[in-house]
């Protein structure tokens, strides 16, 4: 799998391209700006770009209106297809944000329910009770994601919903030639849905990468042969953040040894987790590419802006074993000197 030895560059398109925070309905091809960065991203050593939400939404991107259309604030499907083509020409894979747990109140099927209530053919696409009311006085109650009622939870046990999502993924492959998906709040997704998604993506006949957003807990529940290829390793991200900002080097040592140490009992031997390394502000135009930055070795965890990020995939395999051992040795020495242990 190509992703197992990749460095990912994350772009939050709405912020990166300077789009309005609220969808104003105007079609502006701002997404084409990303093509200007392709050479710079490649020279950083990144060979994949992960795009945060790109599709039509009410505001921040995670409140989707339509999975089939690029957000008008960013341009059209043709504009984004041109960007993907440029990235591929520079040897950069494209991964999109799959926000399948919830949609926005402006989602086309939810608007049909608002209008037709019981008579809507899409009422079972969501978790709805018509004997209640919502915070927005819709005349029915619905489940929002973790109490955020601007984000309407999809019913992923409904075959029609699953089929719609799969049809959209196939469309993305055909129009944009994407190479994978990052699943938003994967810890909330029905595991049967994840299995179906993996089977569908495997059937596409390509090395299609699936990585899930997981915070804490047992990553093995979601990563495996019939599940996701990888997940976000927030445990190590927290350790990296603490090591650089609080000089707490014990935490990252503990996390690395717990996850990928030499003992047989370590949690994720043989698995590949996506580690968040750095967050940066993005200038209006690409910086000079004369001296490539060492993105692979950057361990800076400052919290600035979600315009762009860098990730590396780590695994308990030969290619990464040396770097893991080196990191833990360094952390042990520094922790010992600082008296933290």
Model segments located where?
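Hydrophobic faces of well-ordered beta-strands that scaffold small-molecule active sites
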Residues: 7-10, 49-51, 94-96, 181, ...
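Conserved, mostly hydrophobic/aromatic
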Residues: 11, 41, 51, 67, ...
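The substrate-binding groove and active-site-proximal loops of carbohydrate-active enzymes
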Residues: 14-31, 63-77, 147-162, 179-188, ...
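Aromatic- and acidic-residue-enriched segments that line the glycan-binding/catalytic groove
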Residues: 26-27, 60-72, 100-140, 199, ...
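Active-site-proximal helices and loops of the catalytic beta/alpha 8
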Residues: 114, 174, 184-267, 292, ...
